[in-house]
Amino acid sequence: MMKRQLHRMRQLAQTGSLGRTPETAEFLGEDLLQVEQRLEPAKRAAHNIHKRLQACLQGQSGADMDKRVKKLPLMALSTTMAESFKELDPDSSMGKALEMSCAIQNQLARILAEFEMTLERDVLQPLSRLSEEELPAILKHKKSLQKLVSDWNTLKSRLSQATKNSGSSQGLGGSPGSHSHTTMANKVETLKEEEEELKRKVEQCRDEYLADLYHFVTKEDSYANYFIRLLEIQADYHRRSLSSLDTALAELRENHGQADHSPSMTATHFPRVYGVSLATHLQELGREIALPIEACVMMLLSEGMKEEGLFRLAAGASVLKRLKQTMASDPHSLEEFCSDPHAVAGALKSYLRELPEPLMTFDLYDDWMRAASLKEPGARLQALQEVCSRLPPENLSNLRYLMKFLARLAEEQEVNKMTPSNIAIVLGPNLLWPPEKEGDQAQLDAASVSSIQVVGVVEALIQSADTLFPGDINFNVSGLFSAVTLQDTVSDRLASEELPSTAVPTPATTPAPAPAPAPAPAPALASAATKERTESEVPPRPASPKVTRSPPETAAPVEDMARRTKRPAPARPTMPPPQVSGSRSSPPAPPLPPGSGSPGTPQALPRRLVGSSLRAPTVPPPLPPTPPQPARRQSRRSPASPSPASPGPASPSPVSLSNPAQVDLGAATAEGGAPEAISGVPTPPAIPPQPRPRSLASETN
């Protein structure tokens, strides 16, 4: 028994790497040997693929249609959508879309269930039979044949040995009738019978194995059809799913499109302005000049011509975004952006840069570069004029409009610091750039050089705008914006900016109103208290130099300054001011300079009074006896000038009509009443004002 097992192990060790065995090789031809080698790989492939396909199934394997659909994730998604759209308005866009999505998910779940059931029937079950039944049966016959052949070979060896032993015993002189000879002969006969029986079994098993191999060869094509059928089932599943999705999407888009074209939605639909070609934009809106160009130019003409660094300083991103949105949605509501010229300039640059094709066109790029490379000014101007004539009509009209505006902007370069060169640097790359080409570093360097030439082209266009684009231009082409002329804007700016801060002009000669009644003593005391409070709170400053201006030119600035220096009125004092001791005396008044008493000469206003908290008194001030004179500090005990308008004896009150007139003049100018009253009163000869001693001012302060 041990010898037989050892012989069996030796036979298994002699089996080739290709699966060939010496027991079966002698019964198979070369073709059947190759078929035999494909049995084990085919069995492993069928088993592994069946296992992975089974894992791809989403439903319950082997269940009927309804149970399988309930277990699918798509059906769970459909159920969730059905529960969700019940809480929404069924007439809303979201409710309709969710309802349609719920229905299509349910349909897709049923298609998936049908796909899985077909896959199980046509692919999974045949692969399972192949890997679990058919191929294992063939391999089982192979193993049986190998065992029978091995046993047959062993039996033949024993028979051969027994026959040899029987012949050797006869050769040694044993009689044929002896017991040992009889026993050996019986053994040989028994082995021959066993060998013949085993040979018959080997031949029978061999025939069965060969039949299995031939059957496998004939069925091998059908086994390959399992995988073809898998792809067909998948294609049919995806085709049905796609058809259902296309139908649902068409219906959903149709319903959603009707909702978009409803009156409420149409009211909020605005045409695109930025990022659209110039010709398309002008055709859609029926304009001659692009809306962003005209709107930004009109706003800049209104507020931004004197803004320093215009087009160079960047604006806030949020303001710029809101301006661009308002430009497309409601161009009539752009007034709020007029106060931010940098945002308006940024919107104009953004529009020019976002054009699909530059305003000066790609086709004429090389022509612009050649014109800019000319050194002689006359030839360059002629070349630029020729290139301009070749522009499309809509590009030419918009370029002419823009260059006229930029030339107007350059006229204010003393204030806004934007020379034609500076304007060309910031706007040139937005008006012309080369077509995009994939290239090496040399082409990139050439592009940077061309940008410098573009700046030269735009600068020449700005400088020669009147020559290249002759004739006047109406910037308010569409009439959509309020026509604000540059001259009005400049005069308004000058009136508000050129405000003298060191002089009070002579009031305009207007008809004087009726003389006011004589003031009561209380106002005089109030004026004196106000003056003393002002002198005690504010330290003295040296007198400012005079600035001589004609009355018509300076009336408006003074009024504007008085308006800007208004402060809350101080509280009225309830008691008279303290009196200065009589030991103090005033020095003699210096002689007046020639021409200082003329009505047309403005008098200096102390700088400390500008921006102070002084307000006009609530009662009319006393009429001054003399025209305005240079402000001089005066002793508190200096005699007051006699006034014909004040009744009664002259009072030694510190509220005299020299310095108090200076104090009240600035305050009264804020109310607009005092200067006119002063100019209409006859001026009798007056005592010159006495300067206030420096020692007295220091003691008082």
UniProtKB/Swiss-Prot annotation:
Which PROSITE patterns does its entry note? BAR, RHOGAP
Carrying Phosphothreonine, the residues are: T601, T626
Fetch the SMART domains from UniProt: BAR, RhoGAP
Main location per the UniProt record? other
Q: What does this protein do?
A: GTPase activating protein (GAP) which specifically converts GTP-bound Rho-type GTPases including RAC1 and CDC42 in their inactive GDP-bound form. By specifically inactivating RAC1 at the leading edge of migrating cells, it regulates the spatiotemporal organization of cell protrusions which is important for proper cell migration. Also negatively regulates CDC42 in the process of actin remodeling and the formation of epithelial cell junctions. Through its GAP activity toward RAC1 and/or CDC42 plays a specific role in phagocytosis of large particles.
List residues of the BAR domain: 17-262
The record's GO CC annotations read:
adherens junction; bicellular tight junction; cell leading edge; cytosol; lamellipodium; nucleus; phagocytic cup; plasma membrane
Q: Where is the composition biased (Pro residues)?
A: 508-522, 570-579, 587-596, 618-630, 641-652, 682-692
Q: Where is this region: Interaction with CGNL1?
A: 1-275
User: Which keywords accompany this UniProt record?
Assistant: Cell junction, Cell projection, Cytoplasm, GTPase activation, Nucleus, Phagocytosis, Phosphoprotein, SH3-binding, Tight junction
Tell me where it resides. Cell projection; Cell junction, Tight junction; Cell junction, Adherens junction; Cell projection, Phagocytic cup
What is the name listed in the Swiss-Prot or TrEMBL entry for this protein?
SH3 domain-binding protein 1
Return the Basic residues bias intervals: 1-10
Domain remark in the UniProt entry: The BAR domain mediates interaction with the exocyst components EXOC4 and EXOC8 and is required for the function in cell migration. It also mediates the interaction with PLXND1.
Q: Where is this site: Arginine finger?
A: R312
Q: Where is the Rho-GAP domain?
A: 276-469
- UniProt GO molecular function: GTPase activator activity; semaphorin receptor binding; SH3 domain binding
Does Cytoplasm count among this protein's keywords? Answer: yes
Q: Provide an example Pfam family for this protein.
A: RhoGAP
Alphabetical GO biological process terms:
actin filament organization; cell junction assembly; cell migration; establishment of epithelial cell apical/basal polarity; negative regulation of small GTPase mediated signal transduction; phagocytosis, engulfment; positive regulation of GTPase activity; regulation of actin cytoskeleton organization
Q: How does it assemble?
A: Interacts with RAC1. Interacts with the exocyst via EXOC4 and EXOC8; required for the localization of both SH3BP1 and the exocyst to the leading edge of migrating cells. Interacts with CD2AP and CGNL1; probably part of a complex at cell junctions. Interacts with CAPZA1; recruits CAPZA1 to forming cell junctions. May interact with AFDN. Interacts with PLXND1; they dissociate upon SEMA3E binding to PLXND1 allowing SH3BP1 to transduce downstream signal through RAC1 inactivation. Interacts with ABL1, GRB2 and SRC (via SH3 domain).
Q: Where is the composition biased (Low complexity)?
A: 666-677
- Stretches the record annotates as Interaction with CD2AP: 470-701
List the signal peptide residues. Answer: none
Q: Where is this motif: SH3-binding?
A: 616-625
